[in-house]
Regions:
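Hydrophobic transmembrane helix bundles of membrane-integrated enzymes that assemble
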Residues: 11-36, 47-66, 70-215
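Short, intrinsically disordered terminal tails adjacent to the first/last structured region
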Residues: 1-14
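Flexible, glycine-rich phosphate/dinucleotide-binding loops
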Residues: 40
């Protein structure tokens, strides 16, 4: 049984249907990813509501999944470390990452990435389009960069221009993990997406994002 679960969790998608426990995990993952994908952050009421909804889905998922005593102990230990990290840093990120790992039993990794890619793509492009259409606030920062004096950096709906560019990096990570391309297709896709990287850079002027994408 343990061997079967291990193989399944490494990305097997032999099962054609979605079990309830799997659906609740995807809901948990999608809610948190969408919240971050549209630029929500800690301290915002909407982000807190997303955390509550996601945690509810996580609890339901855990209740629907059979666990051995040892697995439950491991989950509790991991969650305890997540809580300690939150208490010491004030950031929810570590605790959320722990939940993502702790709830993975009976959930194929590749399906998780497919759900994540779909959610992040919708969140990323909808945020940018709404910002360009002036439907949501667009933060502008004036910095002295590039030896050109003061320039304007735009966030395109995100909390900070750096967050905009990092969000694009995450989009690329999803794409290249899931894409099954031959050498020629990979070169073309890389060139096009790197062109998108420079387009985002024109707004963000984020060296961090530019370097991450290049690496």
């Amino acid at each position: 049984m343990e061997q079967k679960n291990a193989v399944y969790n490494m990305g097997s998608e032999r099962g054609t249907g979605f079990r309830p426990e799997e659906i609740f995990y995807y809901l948990f993952f999608a809610i948190m990813l969408f919240a971050k994908g549209i630029g929500l952050y800690e301290g915002m009421k909407s982000f807190r509501l997303c955390i509550i909804a996601a945690f509810f889905c996580f609890v339901v998922k855990v209740c629907l999944t059979e666990h051995t005593v040892g697995e439950l102990v491991q989950m509790l230990v991991l969650m305890a470390f997540g809580v300690l990290a939150y208490r010491n840093s004030g950031e929810m990120a570590a605790f959320i990452y722990v939940l993502v790992v702790a709830g993975m039993k009976h959930v194929p990794v590749k399906r998780v990435f497919k759900v994540g890619a779909a959610v992040w793509t919708v969140a990323f492009f909808s945020t940018i389009v709404l910002a360009l259409l002036k439907q949501i606030p667009d933060l502008a920062l004036v910095h002295s960069k590039l030896g050109l004096g003061h320039i304007i950096r735009w966030s395109l709906g995100y909390p900070h221009p750096n967050v905009l560019h990092i969000s694009y990096v995450i989009l690329l990570a999803f794409f290249f993990y899931l894409a099954n391309l031959n050498r020629k297709q990979l070169i073309i896709a890389t060139a096009l997406l790197y062109g998108g990287n420079f387009y985002i850079f024109l707004y963000s002027v984020s060296y961090t994002g530019l370097i991450l994408t290049t690496v």
